[in-house]
């Protein structure tokens, strides 16, 4: 039995999230259907992060076990030939038995793309969030600093969250403006259900002047979901990358086709 890892990208706007659900259109169902067609045998995948309805994947990682012997490029091209245009396998790689797409990961990174303009753009529908009033980027970055470190993030956790503990370690939040867009980057060991969208709701409240910077610390300390801002829209949220130990040599996400990806790649080079 061989263990194969895949890097998967998808436009999540047409799907009811990642996880398979009866009578619902999900990314997992489409991927496993395509793998079954290509492999001519049922394939069950394990995913790094279960994204919600409308959330996109740039650097999603899955693994599955199979007795089939196929070249890496065959897994990519063969599976893609049975996938819709909104999902694509980017790479395939044999892995040792100890590799696990979810439990071997030590961090996840999400991007949020926010369009700030008086009028919404239909060209960005489902690809970016939108607010019609200007935002104070400096205030949002200062507010984000209150969240860094290991905390109980119950105030940013949905009622449907199944995580065993609300304690997570948030390593990094970056906020950067580029023209009519504000870009956010969140990096943590793991995230709770709706956590990034709930963080976004609070950051936008602060950026829009509806709450002071210090309010973020009060929300965190409250551990009360009702004390925080409403859950923000999913449209601009992307699972950007999943971090693994170097021993697994997991390929980096192929994000060159995403124009705004230069926001963070250029920053890394400076």
Swiss-Prot record:
Gene3D superfamilies: Pseudouridine synthase I, catalytic domain, C-terminal subdomain, Pseudouridine synthase I, catalytic domain, N-terminal subdomain. Its EC number is 5.4.99.12. Keywords: Isomerase, tRNA processing. The keyword tRNA processing applies. It holds the Pfam family PseudoU_synth_1. It catalyses: uridine(38/39/40) in tRNA = pseudouridine(38/39/40) in tRNA. Substrate binds at residue 110. The active site is at residue 52. It is an enzyme of class 5 (isomerase). It comes from the Bacteria. GO terms for molecular function: RNA binding; tRNA pseudouridine(38-40) synthase activity. GO terms for biological process: tRNA pseudouridine synthesis. NCBIfam families: hisT_truA. PANTHER family: PSEUDOURIDYLATE SYNTHASE, TRNA PSEUDOURIDINE SYNTHASE-LIKE 1. Homodimer. Formation of pseudouridine at positions 38, 39 and 40 in the anticodon stem and loop of transfer RNAs. Belongs to the tRNA pseudouridine synthase TruA family. This is tRNA pseudouridine synthase A. The gene is truA.
């Amino acid at each position: 039995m061989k263990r194969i890892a895949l890097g998967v990208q998808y436009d999540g706007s047409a799907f009811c999230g990642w996880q398979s659900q009866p009578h619902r259109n999900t990314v997992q169902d489409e991927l496993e259907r395509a793998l079954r067609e290509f492999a001519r045998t049922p394939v069950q995948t394990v995913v790094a992060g279960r994204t919600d309805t409308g959330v996109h994947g740039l650097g999603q990682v899955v693994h599955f076990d199979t007795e089939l012997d196929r070249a890496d490029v065959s897994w990519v091209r063969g599976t893609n030939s049975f996938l819709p245009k909104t999902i694509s396998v980017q790479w395939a790689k044999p892995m040792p038995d100890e590799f696990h797409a979810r439990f071997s990961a030590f961090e996840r990174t999400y991007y949020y793309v926010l369009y700030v303009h008086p009028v919404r753009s239909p060209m960005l529908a489902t690809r970016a969030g939108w607010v019609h009033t200007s935002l104070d980027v400096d205030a949002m970055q200062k507010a984000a600093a209150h969240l860094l470190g290991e905390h109980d993030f119950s105030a940013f956790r949905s009622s449907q969250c199944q995580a065993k503990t609300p304690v997570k370690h948030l390593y990094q939040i970056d906020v950067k403006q580029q023209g009519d867009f504000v870009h956010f980057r969140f990096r943590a060991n793991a995230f709770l259900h709706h956590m990034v969208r709930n963080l976004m709701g609070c950051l936008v409240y602060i950026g829009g002047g509806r709450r002071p910077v210090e309010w973020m610390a009060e929300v965190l300390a409250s551990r009360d979901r009702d004390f925080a801002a409403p859950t923000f829209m999913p449209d601009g949220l992307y699972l950007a990358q999943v971090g693994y130990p170097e021993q697994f040599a997991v390929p980096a996400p192929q994000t060159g086709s995403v124009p705004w990806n230069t926001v963070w790649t250029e920053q890394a080079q400076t």
